[in-house]
Amino acid sequence: MEPLPEPASGPRPRPHRLLLLSLLLLLLPLLPAPELGPRQARAEDTDWVRLPSKCEVCKYVAVELKSAFEETGKTKEVIDTGYGILDRKASGVKYTKSDLRLIEVTETICKRLLDYSLHKERTGSNRFAKGMSETFETLHNLVHKGVKVVMDIPYELWNETSAEVADLKKQCDVLVEEFEEVIEDWYRNHQEEDLTQFLCANHVLKGKDASCLAEQWSGKKGDTAALGGKKSKKKSGRAKGLGGGSSKQRKELGDLDGDPSPEEDEGIQKASPLTHSPPDEL
């Protein structure tokens, strides 16, 4: 049998090419990672911070406008315009129908949104509400009991305004300025119409997503946020028996009920300082 012909061998790689390839493989892990595009960056940010939509902003602007107009509409004050002095006729305008009331309400309306908190345990626009969120209420209760809570957020910043609420106020300033004439038109001519429908559905969100306007929060038993941050407290039987008692007695009763004062709360947490560590240590 004739021996099989040996396969033709190709050109051997040159040594300098092998060296270059080795260097590339070594340097590859050290190369910087490609930067995320705007869409990718926003997608990652949504896992932690989700800024309010225009629908959410308009919804709570309307809520606070209604509340402010209701609060200022109970007075019977009459504003003296200064006219009619020469003809000795009484001159004045009811505060409830005055320009002054409209100006005072619209100039302070956005500051009211800073009373809101972010409730991440809720969905949709209901995540914005007054009062402490369920999550932080639980954490505060743990601190009251002397439990050491480990979080990335320092204890002093627990009650600070969140990025979402700060943006809610910022967008409110822009919205009120942009739709100032619409609010004024409602105030003068259309107060019989619902302000949320008139301002948001008919103007601000016309042709846009307005689904959040229909979202409502029924609230849970004992949920302070559903009551605007106010939680009614019933007197205990011992407190009633004492008829109110002295401040010292009330303080002792408060200690027995396990409801520490703000000073005690801060003292407890200072005794158990928070340390920065990964979230999974909570």
From Swiss-Prot:
Compositionally biased tracts (Acidic residues): 255-266
Glycosylated residues (UniProt): 159
Top-level taxon of the source organism: Eukaryota
Keyword field: Chaperone, Coiled coil, Disulfide bond, Endoplasmic reticulum, Glycoprotein, Immunity, Innate immunity, Signal
Subcellular location field: Endoplasmic reticulum
UniProt-listed InterPro entries: DUF3456
Domain Saposin B-type: 53-275
GO biological processes: innate immune response
Coiled coil: 159-185
One example GO MF annotation: signaling receptor binding
Region span, Disordered: 221-282
Disulfide bonds: 55-212, 58-200, 110-172
Signal peptide (UniProt feature, chain positions): 1-33
Function: Toll-like receptor (TLR)-specific co-chaperone for HSP90B1. Required for proper TLR folding, except that of TLR3, and hence controls TLR exit from the endoplasmic reticulum. Consequently, required for both innate and adaptive immune responses.
Family: Belongs to the canopy family.
Protein name: Protein canopy homolog 3
